[in-house]
Regions:
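Glycine- and acidic-residue-biased ligand/ion/polar-headgroup-sensing regions
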Residues: 1-12, 30-31
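ATP/adenylate-binding site constellation spanning eukaryotic-like Ser/Thr protein kinases
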Residues: 8, 30, 55, 63, ...
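Cytochrome P450 core scaffold surrounding the K-helix E-X-X-R motif
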Residues: 14-20
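Cyclic-nucleotide recognition modules
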Residues: 24-82
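Short Pro-Cys-Gly-centered "Cys-loop" motif that presents a nucleophilic cysteine in a tight turn
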Residues: 82-83, 90, 107
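Short, Lys/Arg-enriched N-terminal segment that forms or immediately precedes the first helix
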Residues: 86-97
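Phosphate-/nucleic-acid-contacting segments
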Residues: 101-149
Length: 149
């Protein structure tokens, strides 16, 4: 299990069903982290994969090294645990959004929450994150129902 510090590029956290259909849970870019900390603490397997969306440069620590570091630095540990809770809340909010909002609403929420990523995330990945086909995303844009600017 790893602790990732993103220096350049974009990562995604994904889950896949047995047929290989992928659901993107979140994107993370420069200055952000991705982590398997919760699974490590709970002594469970990681229920998701962390993959590159774009060319990525990261700094990584094993979970053992990272936990040893934060144990020696209580303010860092406190901030880190807060960040982990925010990440988990973000994933929950995204999952709820997929169920409660229509396609234009999901796009609008992404634009509001992640505007800097719109031009950087490939449209195929964005469509997948929003639980849309790339064709539907393109059609919504063409018909003026969404604005990806």
């Amino acid at each position: 299990m790893q602790q990732y510090f993103i220096l350049d590029g974009i990562l995604k956290r994904v889950v896949s069903n047995p047929a290989g259909k992928e659901m993107i849970l979140r994107f993370a870019a420069e200055t952000e982290i991705d982590t398997s900390y919760a699974a490590w603490r709970l002594k469970t397997t990681i229920p998701y994969a962390i993959r590159a969306v774009t060319r990525v440069r990261t700094a990584e620590l094993s979970m053992e090294e990272w936990v040893a570091f934060v144990e020696r630095h209580p303010p860092v540990k406190s901030q880190f645990e807060f960040e982990v809770m925010k990440l988990m809340s973000e994933v929950m909010a995204h999952t709820i959004t997929l169920h409660l909002l229509d396609a234009p609403g999901r796009v609008a929420r992404f634009m509001r929450k992640h505007a800097p990523l719109v031009e950087r995330v490939p449209k195929k990945e964005l469509a997948s994150y929003l639980n849309l086909s790339p064709e539907t995303l393109s059609r919504l844009k063409r018909r003026g129902k969404i604005d990806l600017q």
